[in-house]
């Protein structure tokens, strides 16, 4: 009878409780709900095609500098000549990495626009009814969108502004090419408008007010290249907003702690990509740089790829007393018994019947060696702690902006305003970073030494190309393997001029948008 009564009651009172409908009243009322809404826009930075991708944004910022070279070892890493072309600045407008960099940046802007469109669908189009939380969410999405535009600006210069939110029909969106200065002004205006609405709390991995300060400082640091006029005072002011903002950012007492597998919420990191070896993949730096024999040394489940390394000239910028030198592996690779591992290259014509002792050397003798005799050449990068037992992806978060960079940025601004030499305040800022590395404090400092210090501190973190351009050292490319091609033929030095400071608009972008884009000069 009880069961029958329940059935009868259910049939006469058909008012089901709804759990899944999203309305303006029941959604977007907590930070957690908005985090779910915007998660996909942040997720653009993870994965194999994300920010640290070996064939995209990161490679464009690093492979093209003195920090990274990828020698072809036998047949490994030739990749149709792309790594060599990137290193030697002989890329063209359909080079793989250049195509991928564009897709990454504008894939990010599109996802941010989707977030903003969803907010309008949930909250309605009457903005007068939006509450503080809604405006904070909009500001976060727009700041992230400005970040992706900044990446595109830095790489390609004269690009498009992707801010279409209201228009649902993508075919009706008018694509237009803007000048570098116009893109710069768009990003600046977006950030200045968003900053008052952003949360002023420290939320690890999110676009908050201090992160926007860091992005704006980066924009102003490179303003002369982007817009034709330096903005050193503005850059310094926004660095101060972080330094004096009470956010709790400090230098970690141990440099290598910043990059450990447990670096989440490290007080030095201002804005990271939050990686996870299982659920948020994408940090593969240990995998691409370590030699195959390092699999057993680090207990990795798959062999590393024996690819990117640094140049001897860059490695030699580190004093032996510099604790940051520990981010590079040079020397014998030892087995569990303390003996040097012997590696069989498979090429009987080299070494001892094809076998070479596993001794990593700083010097890279050839950028292309079909014999594989260069198998152990080039210092390997272990800043991001290789974790025992992992496979392809690491758990270490990747810092895009960190406190040490902010200190060095402000010091640079002060030096630029002081004829290129450090005053007392600039010295004090740089020495915070320099002495943390176990070195004696500077008593004087010029811009060339500051550039070297930035390199030592920020190696492989995606800043080197930008820095070399700002210091006038990029186009001239005076590092190893820049004077001869892979076959030993001399490269015409007249090819290297300022046009390489920006990459070409990818061929596929121009083909898909006929009549819209004018190719960047020199391509």
What does each of the following model-derived ranges do?
Residues 10-13, 68, 77, 105-108, ...:
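Long, intrinsically disordered, low-complexity segments
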Residues 12-80, 159, 163, 184, ...:
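An aromatic- and glycine-enriched ligand-binding surface/loop that stacks and positions planar moieties
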Residues 35-36, 43-49, 75-156, 178-182, ...:
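Conserved, well-structured interaction surfaces
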């Amino acid at each position: 009878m009880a069961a029958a009564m329940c059935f009868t009651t259910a049939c006469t009172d058909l008012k089901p409780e709804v759990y899944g409908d999203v309305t303006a009243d029941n959604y977007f009322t907590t930070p957690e709900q908005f985090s779910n809404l915007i998660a996909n826009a942040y997720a653009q930075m993870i994965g194999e095609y994300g920010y640290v991708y070996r064939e995209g944004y990161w490679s464009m910022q690093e492979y093209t500098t003195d920090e990274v070279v990828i020698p072809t070892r036998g047949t490994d890493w030739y990749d149709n000549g792309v790594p060599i072309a990137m290193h030697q600045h002989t890329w063209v407008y359909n080079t793989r990495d250049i195509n991928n960099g564009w897709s990454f940046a504008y894939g990010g802007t599109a996802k941010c626009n989707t977030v903003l469109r969803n907010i309008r669908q949930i909250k309605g189009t009457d903005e007068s009814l939006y509450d503080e939380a809604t405006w904070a969410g909009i500001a976060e999405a727009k700041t992230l969108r400005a970040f992706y535009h900044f990446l595109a600006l830095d790489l390609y210069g004269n690009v498009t502004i992707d801010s279409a939110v209201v228009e649902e029909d993508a075919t009706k969106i008018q694509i237009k090419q803007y000048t570098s200065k116009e893109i710069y002004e768009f990003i600046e205006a977006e950030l200045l408008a968003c900053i008052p609405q952003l949360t002023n709390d420290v939320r690890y991995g999110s676009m908050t007010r201090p992160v926007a300060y860091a992005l704006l400082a980066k924009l102003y640091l490179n303003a002369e290249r982007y817009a034709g006029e330096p903005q050193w005072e503005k850059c310094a002011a926004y660095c101060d907003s972080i330094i004096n903002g009470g956010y709790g950012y400090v230098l970690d007492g141990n440099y290598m702690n910043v990059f450990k597998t447990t670096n989440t919420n490290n007080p030095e990191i201002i804005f990271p990509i939050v990686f996870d070896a299982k659920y948020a993949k994408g940090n593969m730096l240990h995998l691409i740089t370590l030699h195959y024999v390092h699999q057993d040394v680090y207990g990795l489940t798959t062999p590393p790829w024996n690819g990117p390394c640094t140049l001897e000239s860059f490695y030699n910028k580190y004093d032996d007393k510099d604790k940051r030198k520990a981010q590079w592996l040079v020397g014998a690779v030892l087995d569990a018994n303390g003996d040097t591992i012997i590696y069989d290259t498979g090429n009987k014509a080299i070494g001892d019947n094809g076998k070479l002792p596993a001794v990593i050397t700083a010097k890279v003798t050839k950028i292309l060696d079909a014999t594989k005799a260069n198998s152990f050449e080039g210092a390997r990068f272990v800043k991001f702690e290789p974790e025992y037992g992992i496979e392809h992806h690491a758990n270490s978060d990747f810092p895009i902006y960190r406190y040490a960079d902010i200190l060095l940025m402000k010091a640079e601004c002060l030096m630029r305003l002081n004829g290129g030499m450090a005053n007392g305040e600039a010295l004090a800022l740089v020495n915070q970073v320099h002495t943390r590395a176990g070195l004696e404090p500077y008593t004087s400092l010029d811009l060339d030494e500051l550039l070297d210090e930035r390199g030592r501190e920020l190696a492989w973190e995606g800043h080197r190309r930008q820095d070399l351009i700002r210091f006038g050292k990029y186009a001239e490319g005076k590092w190893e393997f820049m004077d001869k091609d892979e076959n030993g033929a001399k490269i015409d030095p007249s090819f290297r001029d300022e046009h390489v400071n920006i990459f070409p608009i990818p061929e596929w972008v121009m083909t898909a948008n006929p009549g819209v884009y004018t190719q960047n000069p020199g391509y």
